[in-house]
Each structure stands twice: as structure tokens, then as C-alpha cells.
Amino acid sequence: MYAAKGTQAYAQIGVESAVMSASQQQLVTMLFDGVLSALVRASLFMQDNNQQGKGVSLSKAINIIENGLRVSLDEESKDELTQNLIALYSYMVRRLLQANLRNDVSAVEEVEALMRNIADAWKESLLSPSLIQDPV
């Protein structure tokens, strides 16, 4: 029992240290990794009929999408990509809420595929510094 709590404490410190020293681009990458991890876990919990695990994982994914990825976008922007991402994130949240209510693994997998495409595009853009704009 004590060892598990100690391990969790060290893991939490490691995450906090990584966040504190990360660039904005690395933070967004961490958000993508976190939401994808939560979605994979939600699918597995749904397949195992683990309602509590499913709920916790879907809540985490929704929280990251709404309070991490979506709020980092400028909703007042007229940029088409920004507006499309805002709409897509809203769609993903709706699908995850439906997945939770209906125990619909395919909805979680749909959101995971969409998110993986966005995450892959983001990570690819990091390899081309000319594609990354500095925040204003």
C-alpha cells in the first residue's frame, strides 16, 4: 500500500516537472497524448463492462478536449482551421457523451481516430518549424 502511494507521488512529481519545463508545443503534444490514452482506456473498460473505469476515462478525455485543447484556440478568430477545430472538438465531446450513455465503443473509436489524425498532423507540423506560428 505504502509503495503504491509513493510510486504515485513520484509519478505526479515527474508529470509536474515535465509540464513546468515544457514549451507550448510540447504542452499541446502532452494534451494529445493524454486524451488518446484516456480514449484507449475507455474502450478497454467498455469492453470489460467496467462502468467506473469507463466513466473516469471518458470524463478525463472530455476534460482534456474542452479545457485543454479547445480553450487554447481563439474562438474569435476568423481563421478557417481554428473554427473547424472548435467545431470538431465540440462534435467529439458530444460523441463521447453519447458513447457514455449508450455504452458505444464505436463512438469512442471514432473520436480516437479523429483525435489521432489531428495529433499526428500536429506532431508532423513540429518537424516543419515554418508551419508553427508564434502566439500573439
From Swiss-Prot:
Single GO biological process annotation from the record: bacterial-type flagellum-dependent cell motility
Entry keywords, A to Z: Bacterial flagellum biogenesis, Chaperone, Cytoplasm
Gene3D superfamilies: Flagellar protein FliS (1.20.120.340)
Cellular compartments per GO CC: cytosol
Record's subcellular location: Cytoplasm, Cytosol
One Pfam family, short name: FliS
Domain of life where this protein originates: Bacteria
NCBIfam families: fliS
Family statement: Belongs to the FliS family.
UniProt xrefs under PANTHER family: FLAGELLAR SECRETION CHAPERONE FLIS
Name of this protein: Flagellar secretion chaperone FliS
Native source organism of the sequence: Escherichia coli (strain K12)
